Amino acid sequence: MIASVGDSRYYPKSVANGEKSDQRERLVSAIPVEDDSSFELKLRPQWLREFIGQPKVKENLAVAIEAARSRGEALDHVLLYGPPGLGKTTLANIIANEMQAQFQQTSGPTLQIKGDLTAILTNVRDKQVLFIDEVHRLQPALEELLYSAVEDYKLDIIIGQGPSARTHTIDVAPFTLVAATTRAGLLSAPLRSRFGIVLRLEFYTTEDLKIILKRSAEILNVEIDEGGAAEIATRCRGTPRIANRLLRRVRDYAQVRGAGKIDRETAQKALEMLEVDQHGFDEVDRRLMLTIIEKYQGGPVGLNTLAASLAEETDAIEEIYEPFLIQLGFLDRTPRGRVATHLAYEYFKMKPPKKQDSLF
């Protein structure tokens, strides 16, 4: 029997009570948590040849890097975009390694005033890689400061105020800006046009995720067979960060409740205990789909209305929940709003209304 939206047994207490879910508490959230940092550093590939998946991205980068190195120049500026957890930060590190260049990392929200960015740009070294994560959250004034720096390797600094103010131009060492975003549509056209290399990262295939899991298991010194890797790979939402997080939890289960080896049966039992189903859905995904089905007859329902019903931010729905549900075909995003597809009804063993029958 499928629980209804109001059934508190179906969700954690905070979700059932209508509180906003904390993405950091979701096992299948691609948003990084503090606990992930040291763990991810252990598993992070250092070179393009070690990076699994994203063949088009790797090919484009390999050609661009080899060409830049042969000319003795800094690599052209790179924009990496796509859902969280797919390897944008890892690729930025790899670019620096492949270019044998220094690496510096910052983020859009961290840079608050012009002085923050000016201090970084005036100290960049020749061919250095400067990585700005969440670049879509960069303030407009700081965006404008970047224009001349990335295009002409010059920085215009205003000294003084009022009528006596004057502009002083400083030369900046040729460097590579690598920017990452989950919301490419929020970037201004002038900033986006300054990236010579623009690459989209896609969700990973099950086969690639199995290879990633086997590599991670070897580094963690835990035995995993084909069935165990396949079981985790099908439930990690096409995202390596989630795959590695689930691997840690399944490893714990195997050591305490199993024989120390991760096989299919052990992985299934562990993931059932963690309430991650065969699609990689958790209670928050189910709540979103059930809300559309039960409260709005399958949709369409507007984003703001849906966000209010779920007590969630619109950004969280657009950036975190929807991409994977749309990718799997459980949700449609239409001009009139969000629509639950026939797959969502089948998942809950419900019959679509007549309007859904006609659509699918």
UniProtKB/Swiss-Prot annotation:
Residues 1-23 are annotated as: Disordered. DNA binds at R333, R338. SMART domains: AAA. Has 3 domains, the large (RuvB-L) and small ATPase (RuvB-S) domains and the C-terminal head (RuvB-H) domain. The head domain binds DNA, while the ATPase domains jointly bind ATP, ADP or are empty depending on the state of the subunit in the translocation cycle. During a single DNA translocation step the structure of each domain remains the same, but their relative positions change. PANTHER family: HOLLIDAY JUNCTION BRANCH MIGRATION COMPLEX SUBUNIT RUVB, PTHR42848. Mg(2+) binds at T89. Keywords: ATP-binding, Cytoplasm, DNA damage, DNA recombination, DNA repair, DNA-binding, Hydrolase, Nucleotide-binding. Its EC number is 3.6.4.-. Residues 278-360 are annotated as: Head domain (RuvB-H). It holds the Pfam family AAA_lid_4. The lineage of its organism: Bacteria, Pseudomonadati, Acidobacteriota, Terriglobia, Terriglobales. Homohexamer. Forms an RuvA(8)-RuvB(12)-Holliday junction (HJ) complex. HJ DNA is sandwiched between 2 RuvA tetramers; dsDNA enters through RuvA and exits via RuvB. An RuvB hexamer assembles on each DNA strand where it exits the tetramer. Each RuvB hexamer is contacted by two RuvA subunits (via domain III) on 2 adjacent RuvB subunits; this complex drives branch migration. In the full resolvosome a probable DNA-RuvA(4)-RuvB(12)-RuvC(2) complex forms which resolves the HJ. It comes from Koribacter versatilis (strain Ellin345). This is Holliday junction branch migration complex subunit RuvB. GO terms for cellular component: cytoplasm; Holliday junction resolvase complex.
